[in-house]
Amino acid sequence: MTLVKSILLALAAGHVAQAQLNTAAKAAGLLYFGTAVDNPDLSDSKYLVNLETADFGQITPANAMKWQPTEPSQGSYTFTQGDQIASLAKSNNDYLRCHNLVWYNQLPSYITSGSWTNATLIAALKEHINGVVTHYKGQCYAWDVVNEALNEDGTYRQNVFYQHIGEAYIPIAFAAAAAADPNAKLYYNDYNIEYAGAKATGAQGIVKLIQAAGGRIDGVGLQSHFIVGQTPSLATQKANMAAFTALGVDVAITELDIRMTLPDTSALQTQQSTDYQTTTTACVQTKGCVGITLWDYTDKYSWVPGTFSGQGDACPWDSNYNKKPAYYGILAGLQSGSGSSSSTSSTTLITTTTPTASSSTTSATTTSATSGAAHWGQCGGIGWSGPTICVSPYTCQVLNPYYSQCL
């Protein structure tokens, strides 16, 4: 190696080390690079210090704005936890991406066990959305209005809202959110819609459903909970993003993490870095992909080990806040160049001006290999080393080459 080449490589290494993720994201044309946070994490001073750096320009409350914590009894609201995170976003001058208004999980018992009619549940749905969105009006850049409404085959989940209202609950929810805060971006958010298939087609159908009802939907959130070595290819992710943006909506990567089977190895870390780079590059190189959010940035607070037995180390920082190779994979993706990642929708973008996959927002869980994977759990796919049978009465069904699930 020549001396000149050695110097150039050293300079390049120094440049990468000094760059930071949100700065690089904005330079690439994205609005932000951010992370989900949960209220218990905020007592950790080192955690907070890292949030104040130029690595992050957006915050999502992981749990604090969901139905159970915000309206635990009907008509009685509590915003203490959500306000704490909104205040943090304001003090850091970050975008606040609010999460979420309507989900089948983390619902209070008065919703799940209520004696509802179509009319009374519609009224409760509208009242909840109006109460929460009005409280945070002007603070949220975007809302995940409806979260995870689909089964893996693209049909609607049989949740309490669908059972009493039908698919109409989705455009009703979007209309209520739009009325409460006309300037907030409104998203549908889900997992396993990052590649072409029945579920992605179902999500595109939700976009069309809202549009056909005369409503406004501004974007689709691609959660992107991936597995090391099984992340969809760059071409696959870009084509899938383009299928959504062709409908006139933005996309955002909303809950990114890439888990591995433990114990961690250098080879797994290298592959994880490549997988993070692939996903980041897909967003940067897709017009209409507006930003990327990690589902927490450090392994110390990751939801993965508590949900997927034997798996973890899914984040770009380790439990001691050291940057892993994944961090530099993200940075390389952000510096990969693009056409343009600007928004495809026409509503006004806002940042937080005054004070959001769920430590686990996905419903997939696993159990030990001896007992089989639980309902909705992963049971196969390229590189999968976990259980390949399901607990009764569920069966393992192949959804795509990367993912089989107990259904």
UniProtKB/Swiss-Prot annotation:
It catalyses: Endohydrolysis of (1->4)-beta-D-xylosidic linkages in xylans. Pfam families: CBM_1, Glyco_hydro_10. It is found in: Secreted. One of its GO terms (cellular component) is extracellular region. Disulfide bonds join C283-C289. Coiled coil: none annotated. Inhibited by wheat xylanase inhibiting protein I (XIP-I). Residues 337-364 are annotated as: Disordered. Its EC number is 3.2.1.8. Residues 371-407 form the CBM1 domain. It comes from Talaromyces funiculosus. This is Endo-1,4-beta-xylanase D. GO terms for molecular function: cellulose binding; endo-1,4-beta-xylanase activity. Its main location: secreted. Residues 20-333 form the GH10 domain. Optimum pH is 4.2-5.2 for birchwood xylan and 4.0 for CM cellulose. The active site is at E148, E255. It comes from the Eukaryota. Pathway: Glycan degradation; xylan degradation. GO terms for biological process: xylan catabolic process. Residues 1-19 form the signal peptide. Keywords: Carbohydrate metabolism, Disulfide bond, Glycoprotein, Glycosidase, Hydrolase, Polysaccharide degradation, Secreted, Signal, Xylan degradation. Endo-1,4-beta-xylanase involved in the hydrolysis of xylan, a major structural heterogeneous polysaccharide found in plant biomass representing the second most abundant polysaccharide in the biosphere, after cellulose. Shows an endo-mode of action on xylan forming mainly xylobiose and short-chain xylooligosaccharides (XOS).
